[in-house]
Amino acid sequence: QPPIEKDVNDKAEATLEARDEEFTYHVKTKIPYEATAFNITDTLKDVLDFSGEKGQAEATVDGKKLSDDHIAINGQTITVTLNQEELKANADKEIKLTFKAKIREGANLSDYIEKGKTVINNQASYNAAFPNDPNFHKDSNIVPVTPPNPENPPIEKKVNEAESANLGARDEEFTYTIDTTVPLDVTGFAVYDTIEKVLEFSGENGQASATVDGQPLDASHITIKGQKITVKLTEDEAKALGGKAVHVSFKAKIKAGANLSDYIEKDGTTRIYNTAKYNFNNDPGTEQSSKPVPVIPPTPTEPELKKEVNGKEAET
């Protein structure tokens, strides 16, 4: 029986320049002799979508376009079907299906990563009925599509909604915020921040809160251990929320009695820096860091040195 061939963008495989790039599949074979029933089917992976109405699909026999009612899309499967009369009239003629697809927006491709490369394979097939074989099935070659690897999103930390904070008083409470995005195609994600030893979380659990895509996360996602605060998503959440904005907020202050001499810089100013970080897939090698954010407490006043003699400034 005739082979069935599939290509993408007229090639055996396609490397996309952009994740949202549209690509074109072609499937072709010949109509078998003596077939009493025949269809071509192609089921897209669940991370793909047909692009445009009915995938902008078109089918031809011997170069002549078939009417659209020959083509049906049900979920992820596109099917081209010929009736018995068409089969008899067109035996051994080429039938070709063309349609367009793209990667589904927000799709998590972690299941398609092999050795650091993302590959989405697809395969077409045809089904035919013959007098001696009513359930004949034949598969095409496998056609891979490779999207570009997603870039790591930036992470930004602020204090009191600014890049630095000058405190009015040494014991003043201040608010750290962290903003980033859940990376695409990950199976785990955590944002964390280890505050300097001279700082402490202010209030119960640092009055911490976190949102993803503007929706609050419950407290079980936030943990504080020693000087470190962590906001962590489950595997299902990380997969479902790729590309969504993450916002973390917590409060801190300088510890009472803390010695800040290690934080005095050459210009005489005391600056306490802190950096937020994230990693994904529980892999420390994926860690990304924000710019350091300084908190600047007021310079302590020198204590007055006063000397007296017999309770007086002078004695004669």
Residue ranges and their predicted role:
Residues 1-9, 109-114, 118-160, 260-265, ...:
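Extracellular/luminal low-complexity Ser/Thr/Pro-rich, glycosylation-prone repeat/linker regions
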Residues 3, 35-39, 56-58, 154, ...:
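Exposed beta-strand and adjacent loop surfaces of beta-rich binding modules
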Residues 6, 27, 40, 99, ...:
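Extracellular/surface recognition and adhesion modules
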Residues 17-36, 169-187, 192-194, 309, ...:
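Short beta-strand elements of extracellular/lumenal beta-sandwich folds
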Residues 26-27, 78-118, 178, 229-270:
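Low-complexity, intrinsically disordered segments enriched in Ser/Thr together with acidic residues
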Residues 29-33, 44-46, 63, 101-107, ...:
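Beta-strand elements of well-folded, non-transmembrane domains
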Residues 39-82, 190-233:
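A surface/secretory-pathway sequence property marking extracellular, secreted
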